[in-house]
């Protein structure tokens, strides 16, 4: 099938879309099901199999500024185009793209980093084809509340960093961390003042892999999204130089985030469009081939109408994601609706669940068989409803923005 384009895409964007699609088709899809089905979840991680290929074609470093050796692509729309094609290959591998965007966002936030930090870590990232980064926020009793965020002293990060001279001594535990144990640099949110909430008492540290006192716990055995490894990180008197702190001490999560150019939510949303597109295309081809009652499935109204809804859902979600991405890219020229990024992400995630479920129904009994990818698409879609804060917290965030516009404030129960 032809790739989705519109009249506003540049030749460069069409070319990188085609590149990402070819990588997904030739490199990701042939191994996705095998990795997904691995008995040990640690063996499902995509980077040992695909990391060097992503580096060869330039996708791993596309977000890194040119002055540090990267591709210098900084517009969100192009990242969403790539995210959709990689998501069409497999939802889990999109974390490779997010690693590139995240280290760029952190390092290029001049209020948080120094020139020396940027030179050191961006250069290291570009030179090492297996260099990935991880963000460590979630803990056993601190997850979704960090999104709004909850600012009470009884919540938020419980991982502590106590200053001792030129070092912080870090103790605590993180969980659900993407790429943990493989990534070479970790952006870790810690509590540096336990008498205050995370808006006044939290800080952000960079901790390289191999730092004494840092170890890794169990690999989480997930329902879906299995090609992206998630694992626990354990800090036991981990000694981190003060120079590895980003921004001032106790800068707080809200102020830290205010300096980070957003967009990862929309890249994730674009990946969900790619996932749904894969499920729709599989169902369409199956409906064209399989016969029941003397005619092809697609000729039965119940199936044909379901495919119409799936087609409409995928294209509507893509249009919404693209509109939101372009709004961010052109924020100096057009008014920015702060609700649109979150709303587009919500729509794309819920759409992917509908479309993958409908694809399962069209395949019937064959849909639940593990030799076909349809059940994997469904698992991946529903797994992502509980990622990055979960769908309910995303809705609460958009609701809070609606309330703010109405002159009200969202209140926690």
Residue ranges and their predicted role:
Residues 29-41, 284, 288-295, 311-347, ...:
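C-terminal helix-coil-helix/basic helical segment that borders enzyme active sites and/or dimer interfaces
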Residues 1-97, 120, 401-413:
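Amphipathic, small/basic residue-rich leader segments at the start of a protein or domain
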Residues 129-144:
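A short, Trp-centered hydrophobic/proline-enriched beta-strand micro-motif
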Residues 82, 363-413:
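Glycine-rich phosphate/cofactor-binding loops in nucleotide/flavin-utilizing enzymes
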Residues 161-162:
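A structural signal for short hydrophobic beta-strand segments in well-ordered beta-sheet cores
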């Amino acid at each position: 099938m032809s790739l989705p384009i519109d009249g506003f895409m540049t030749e460069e964007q069409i070319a990188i879309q085609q590149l990402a699609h070819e990588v997904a088709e030739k490199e990701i899809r042939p191994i996705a099901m095998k990795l997904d089905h691995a008995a040990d979840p640690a063996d499902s991680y995509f980077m040992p199999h695909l990391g060097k290929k992503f580096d060869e074609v330039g996708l791993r470093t596309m977000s890194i500024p040119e002055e540090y050796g990267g591709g210098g692509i900084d517009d969100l729309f192009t990242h969403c185009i790539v995210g959709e094609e990689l998501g069409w290959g497999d939802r889990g591998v999109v974390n490779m793209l997010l690693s590139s965007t995240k280290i760029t966002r952190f390092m290029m936030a001049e209020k948080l980093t120094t020139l020396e930090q940027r030179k050191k870590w961006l250069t290291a990232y570009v030179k090492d084809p297996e260099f990935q980064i991880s963000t460590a926020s979630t803990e056993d009793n601190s997850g979704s509340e960090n999104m709004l965020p909850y600012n009470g002293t009884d919540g938020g990060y419980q991982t502590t960093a106590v200053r001792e001279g030129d070092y912080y001594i870090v103790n605590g535990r993180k969980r659900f961390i993407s790429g943990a144990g493989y990534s070479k640099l970790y952006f870790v949110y810690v509590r540096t003042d336990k008498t205050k909430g995370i808006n006044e008492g939290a800080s952000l540290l960079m901790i390289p892999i191999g730092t004494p006192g840092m170890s890794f716990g169990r690999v989480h055995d997930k329902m879906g999204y299995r090609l992206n490894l998630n694992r626990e990180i354990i800090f036991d008197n981990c000694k981190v130089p003060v120079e590895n702190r980003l921004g001032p001490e106790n800068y707080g999560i809200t102020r830290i985030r205010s300096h980070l150019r957003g967009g990862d939510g929309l890249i994730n949303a674009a990946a969900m469009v790619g996932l749904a597109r894969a499920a729709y295309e599989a169902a369409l081809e199956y409906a064209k081939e399989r016969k029941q009652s003397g005619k092809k499935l697609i000729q039965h109204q119940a199936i044909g109408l379901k495919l119409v809804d799936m087609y409409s859902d995928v294209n509507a979600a893509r249009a919404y994601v693209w509109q939101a991405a372009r709004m961010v890219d052109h924020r100096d020229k057009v008014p920015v609706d702060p609700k649109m990024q979150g709303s587009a992400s919500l729509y794309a995630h819920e759409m992917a669940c509908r479309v993958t479920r409908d694809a399962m129904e069209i395949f019937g009994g064959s849909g639940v068989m593990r030799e076909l990818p349809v059940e994997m698409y469904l698992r991946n879609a529903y797994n992502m409803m509980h990622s990055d804060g979960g769908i309910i917290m995303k809705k609460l965030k958009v609701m809070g923005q609606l309330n703010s516009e109405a002159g009200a404030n969202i209140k926690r129960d």
